[in-house]
């Protein structure tokens, strides 16, 4: 089940070791409203069908073609792809480490979870929003938003990704170690 946990970022607190959430909700309408108030897009799409183990990128993109085209058109995104992470992925440790560092992008980060789950952590002013996205969830993080992503130590997800550039995922790391003070997906 999708979940939103809102924490103070701890920058004004003497005790930064174990933040206490200001809000925790698993109600989709409340998640959407809280994120929208902060400029973050969140939608839930019906999960069309189970993803076969052998499903490749073209199969995934075809299964969600109408929804993908709508997001691509509405957001002006140039390209779309699908990424699948498994517990035995050879680069899982390096990728998790990279994604866990706070960063920004020059473009929106838009993800739709076809299967599995991931934790988007958004550092917005004096708040940190931990957004657990699961199968059927779409999140749109605007360009320039400080955030990090946790796919877990044993990642198991497939996500559709939209981009404004042909290069794909390009991050600017902030150097802030804030992500170390907040819960992870595991």
From Swiss-Prot:
Residue sites binding Fe(2+) per the record: 103, 105, 109, 147
Start-end of Polar residues biased regions: 10-20
MF (Gene Ontology): acireductone dioxygenase (Ni2+-requiring) activity; acireductone dioxygenase [iron(II)-requiring] activity; iron ion binding; nickel cation binding
Any GO BP annotation: L-methionine salvage from S-adenosylmethionine
Binding site for Ni(2+): 103, 105, 109, 147
Record has Phosphoprotein as a keyword: no
CDD domains assigned to the protein according to its UniProt record, in alphabetical order: cupin_ARD (cd02232)
Site (Important to generate the dianion): 111
Record protein name field: Acireductone dioxygenase
Species of the source: Synechococcus sp. (strain CC9902)
């Amino acid at each position: 089940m999708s979940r939103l946990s809102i924490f103070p970022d701890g920058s004004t607190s003497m005790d930064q070791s174990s933040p206490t959430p200001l809000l925790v909700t698993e109600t989709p309408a409340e998640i959407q409203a809280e994120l929208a108030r902060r400029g973050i897009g969140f939608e839930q799409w019906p999960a069309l069908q189970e993803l076969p183990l052998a499903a490749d990128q073209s199969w995934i993109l075809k299964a969600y073609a109408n929804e993908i085209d709508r997001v691509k058109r509405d957001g002006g995104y140039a390209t779309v792809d699908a990424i699948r992470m498994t517990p035995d992925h050879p680069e899982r440790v390096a990728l998790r480490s990279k994604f866990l560092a706070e960063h920004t992008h020059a473009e929106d980060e838009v993800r739709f979870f076809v299967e599995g789950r991931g934790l988007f952590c958004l550092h917005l002013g004096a708040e940190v929003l931990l957004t657990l996205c699961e199968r059927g969830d779409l999140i749109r993080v605007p360009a320039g938003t400080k955030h990090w992503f946790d796919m877990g130590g044993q990642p198991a997800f497939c996500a559709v990704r939209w981009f404004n550039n042909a290069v794909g995922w390009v991050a600017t790391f902030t150097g802030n170690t804030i992500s170390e003070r907040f819960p992870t997906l595991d």
